């Protein structure tokens, strides 16, 4: 009974330990497994051959060039890469065939290799067991191949490669990576790949680096009598062809030729108009003229007679409205510059006749007065007989008061003389003068005063400036009696300056 109890206690203890271990394992995460790797069992049984192999092919203790810097590696049994699971050991070799000297020797080596196991290959190989290098072809065989190939020339300049089967070719057995490394380390086959060496020594299948395939060997045929200069020329020709192909691949420029000269396209619609610049408005400071337009029936007659030239005469005091006229204008509905009526021909400008001089009888030799201004008189024969009798009563005339002769003291006569002088000075400034100043621009065009003179633009502008300055001076003389004497002096200076040559 005691034994059964002990067995039951042991079984319960084992069950409890198993349950605890399962619970602990369930609590563990993958991160814990990575942080605390399980201890791996290492094999204690190592053969002497593996020990020798590890001594010969001992891996480096550290990785000098790695992403993590200098990292120590595990021993050779657990060797693994840091990035992948690749072990870095080649298990099989590539099967190649080579030319042997004697068939019997190869058969003996083959049988010996077949008899030995894979572990026998790991033993060091003696010099006698190494494969011997093939013999170079003789001159007789080379000349024979040359004579055969001269009949059939290749189209290209490249050398021909002729592959023929070899009877005594035997394949090489599969080697381990360790044994292959040992063989190559002791006696490696160095290829003659330098160009200077190839020019001096005749090429063969081994010298050119082309070993025989599994089905047979290969012989390398070349043009032996070709000189170095010809080879250089062929290389240059090849380079030229490459350059030409590169140049031809570039798209050339496209040139176009036009046989006809370019012509301008005619407009669909064209109009030609005279250039008429705008005329600035009349200045407010410009003085008004003494003439005004008569309202009523006289406007129709003025429009009919605007084309006729108007004679200019010096006039004195006028009593009738028929004697009052205005400057005739043309094209009153639209504004035109003074250059529109200018004749286009300049030759006639120099050969034109001189203007007529005024008569000496009509000149006023006395001092200048305010009423002695030039007036344009229109001859109206049809309208004078009907309009004179009706408008005599409506017109304003200067009233001249005659001073009666009185016998008084000298003091009274002096006072009367002073009054007469003041009345004479202000006598002509009446309502008629105000009407003339206010209605001077009615029906007139600015800039057309000198349109009928036939002058150039520069001369017309100079004349307009002169008339403008004179009209300002006379207007100031009329409006301000204090400036009358000064105005007379300036007019005298202006007439002296404009007398001529």
From Swiss-Prot:
> Its GO CC terms?
cell division site; cellular bud neck; cellular bud neck septin collar; cellular bud neck split septin rings; cellular bud scar; cytoplasm
Q: Which GO terms describe its biological process?
A: axial cellular bud site selection; establishment of protein localization; regulation of protein localization to cell division site
- Modifications the protein undergoes after translation, according to the UniProt entry: Phosphorylated by CDC28.
Q: According to the UniProt entry, which residues carry Phosphoserine?
A: 138, 208
Q: Where are the compositionally biased (Polar residues) regions?
A: 11-20, 148-158
Region: Disordered; residue ranges are 1-78, 102-133, 146-165, 267-286, 338-366
Q: Which domain of life is it from?
A: Eukaryota
| Cellular location(s) | Bud neck; Cytoplasm
| Segments of skewed composition (Basic and acidic residues) | 46-55
Q: Does the keyword Nuclease apply?
A: no
Q: Which residues carry this modification: Phosphothreonine?
A: 403
Which UniProt keywords are given for this protein, alphabetically ordered? Cytoplasm, Phosphoprotein
Q: Where is this region: Necessary for the normal cellular distribution and bud neck targeting?
A: 275-501
**How does this chain assemble?**
Interacts with NAP1 (via the central domain consisting of amino acids 143 to 362). Copurifies with ribosomes.
Other notes = Present with 6490 molecules/cell in log phase SD medium.
Q: What is this protein called?
A: Protein NBA1
Starting at the broadest rank, the lineage of the source organism is: Eukaryota, Fungi, Dikarya, Ascomycota, Saccharomycotina
